[in-house]
């Protein structure tokens, strides 16, 4: 099965991404070797209980993460996905990442299943703030009511945002090709997305540096770095589309 042919023929390709694609931008992963969880215990930082216990500690960690991401650049994989969208091949991106690198690369329709590190939400009045740079004061406070702000991300033990989950399920359900990039496939309910697409009739194509929990249901598994594989795929898809246009009377 040729992946470039699949993409060139696709009417509704959707991309599903995990931490692996951002690791190529220098953003530490949670679960890979050298990932963030090797340096910190997740229960100390990424839970509602941890935030209630020590919001300043949690925010110092998120400020550090914001600084890493702020100084990072989207990877060639991010740019390739945005280019496929600009070509009309990709109709949407579902991501487990909270870094906003897809948007910085130019992707327009991005569903963020786990929230965004570039938003903060007041725990008292619910006001949401868009952040264009790392927070300065720790912990930040709501300008409207003085309440504590928290990162607008999904912590361990919290449900996914309903609106984002509905949008992701809808995209996956109508996809004819699901391109899975850089995810371990072990974080639920996000890991259901490839299965939802598969059951709806989509071809599942996985690009990963090593086999994952998704690999057994993938129609095609391409082993490699997203930043190397995806730009090559973009060029192959372009050639096929040009050939078709040339043959069209």
UniProtKB/Swiss-Prot annotation:
Binding site for substrate: 62, 65
Amino acids binding Zn(2+): 122, 125, 142, 145
Catalytic residues (positions): 114
Keyword entries, A-Z: Cytoplasm, Metal-binding, NAD, Transcription, Transcription regulation, Transferase, Zinc
Cofactor comment text: Binds 1 zinc ion per subunit.
Required cofactor(s): Zn(2+)
Membrane spanning stretches: none
SUPFAM superfamilies per record: DHS-like NAD/FAD-binding domain
InterPro entries: DHS-like_NAD/FAD-binding_dom (IPR029035), NAD-dep_sirtuin_deacylases (IPR050134), Sirtuin (IPR003000), Sirtuin_cat_small_dom_sf (IPR026591), Sirtuin_class_III (IPR027546), Ssirtuin_cat_dom (IPR026590)
Matches recorded under Pfam families: SIR2 (PF02146)
Domain named Deacetylase sirtuin-type: residues: 1-240
Sites where the protein binds NAD(+): 18-37, 96-99, 182-184, 208-210, 226
Predominant place of localization: cytoplasm
Catalysed reaction equations from the record: N(6)-acetyl-L-lysyl-[protein] + NAD(+) + H2O = 2''-O-acetyl-ADP-D-ribose + nicotinamide + L-lysyl-[protein]; N(6)-succinyl-L-lysyl-[protein] + NAD(+) + H2O = 2''-O-succinyl-ADP-D-ribose + nicotinamide + L-lysyl-[protein]
Family (UniProt): Belongs to the sirtuin family. Class III subfamily.
Functional description taken from the UniProt entry: NAD-dependent lysine deacetylase and desuccinylase that specifically removes acetyl and succinyl groups on target proteins. Modulates the activities of several proteins which are inactive in their acylated form. Deacetylates the N-terminal lysine residue of Alba, the major archaeal chromatin protein and that, in turn, increases Alba's DNA binding affinity, thereby repressing transcription.
NCBIfam families the record matches: PRK00481.1-3 (NF001753), prot_deacyl_CobB (NF040867)
Record's protein name: NAD-dependent protein deacylase 2
Source species of the chain: Pyrobaculum aerophilum (strain ATCC 51768 / DSM 7523 / JCM 9630 / CIP 104966 / NBRC 100827 / IM2)
Gene symbol of the encoding locus: cobB2
């Amino acid at each position: 099965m040729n992946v470039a042919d699949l993409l060139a023929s696709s009417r509704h390709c959707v991309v599903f991404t995990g931490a692996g694609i951002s690791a190529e931008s220098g953003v530490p992963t949670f679960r890979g070797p050298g990932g963030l969880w090797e340096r910190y215990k997740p229960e100390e930082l990424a839970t509602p209980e941890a935030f209630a216990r020590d919001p300043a500690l949690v925010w110092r960690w998120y400020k550090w993460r914001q600084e890493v991401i702020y100084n990072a650049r989207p990877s060639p994989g991010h740019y390739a996905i945005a280019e496929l969208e600009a070509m009309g091949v990709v109709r949407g991106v579902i991501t487990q990442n909270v870094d906003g690198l897809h948007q910085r690369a130019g992707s327009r329709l991005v569903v963020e299943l786990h929230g965004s590190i570039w938003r903060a939400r007041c725990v008292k009045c619910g006001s949401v703030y868009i952040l264009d740079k790392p927070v300065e004061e720790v912990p930040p406070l709501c300008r409207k009511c003085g309440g504590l702000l928290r990162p607008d991300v999904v912590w361990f033990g919290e449900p996914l945002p309903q609106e984002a989950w509905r949008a992701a399920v809808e995209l996956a359900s109508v996809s004819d090709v699901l391109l899975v990039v850089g995810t371990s496939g072990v974080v639920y309910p996000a890991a259901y997305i490839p299965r939802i697409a598969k059951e709806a009739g989509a071809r599942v194509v996985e690009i990963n540096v090593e086999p994952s929990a998704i690999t057994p249901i993938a129609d095609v598994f391409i082993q490699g770095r997203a930043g190397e594989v995806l730009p090559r795929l973009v060029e192959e898809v372009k050639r096929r589309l040009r050939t078709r246009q040339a043959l069209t009377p």
